[in-house]
């Protein structure tokens, strides 16, 4: 998977010795042939953009009200994710994209070695051209939440065209992330 862009999405992250620039350097070391694109918010000026890297600054759309069962907060950053990922994907022309949060990194490139064709699936229900790899970290248990089709925002790896299908929302209002049963 040489035709790869790593899309780093979100605000600048900093905690003790960890920060987004450190994470980006680790990603560059482990994915040396990948392009780097950062999609963040206006006034996020701590990112160190190197030669051949690209950064786009988005208007921050703010949070939306989050009343779903199991939520510990009253605001969801889903709209922020959609805006930064969608705008980032629109700038990418490589075949594959690894979308990752700005507070995350991979210690190796083993994810690129997964043999996805070994897994069976029913072609009648196929939505994507290839499989998309994502994490279970941050994915909600459907038995304890009222958000349908939730998946982790930590990372997505797949065809850029397939990721565009996932992140194609135009806007999200406060209660559109919730559903209710009668």
Predicted feature residues:
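Short acidic donor-binding/metal-coordinating loop in glycosyltransferase active sites
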Residues: 100-104
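Catalytic core and acceptor-binding pocket of nucleotide-sugar-dependent glycosyltransferases
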Residues: 106-182
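Short, well-formed alpha-helical segments that are part of the catalytic scaffolds
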Residues: 14-30
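A short acidic (Asp/Glu
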Residues: 17-20, 47-50, 92, 108-113, ...
């Amino acid at each position: 998977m040489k035709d790869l862009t790593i899309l780093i999405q979100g605000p600048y992250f900093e905690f003790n010795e960890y920060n987004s620039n450190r994470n980006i350097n680790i990603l560059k070391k482990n994915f040396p042939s990948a392009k780097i694109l950062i999609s963040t918010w206006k006034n996020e000026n701590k990112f160190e953009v190197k030669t051949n890297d690209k950064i786009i600054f988005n208007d921050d759309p703010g949070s939306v009200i989050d009343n779903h069962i199991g939520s510990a907060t009253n605001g969801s950053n889903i709209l922020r994710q959609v805006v930064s990922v969608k705008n980032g994907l629109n700038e990418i022309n490589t075949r594959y994209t690894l979308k990752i949060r700005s507070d995350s990194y991979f210690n190796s490139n083993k994810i690129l070695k997964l043999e996805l064709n070994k897994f069976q699936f029913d072609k009648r229900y196929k939505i994507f051209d290839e499989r998309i790899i994502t994490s279970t970290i941050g994915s909600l248990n459907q038995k304890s939440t009222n958000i349908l089709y939730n998946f982790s925002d930590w990372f997505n790896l797949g065809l850029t065209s397939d990721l565009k299908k996932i992140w194609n929302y135009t806007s999200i209002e406060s209660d559109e992330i919730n559903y209710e049963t009668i």
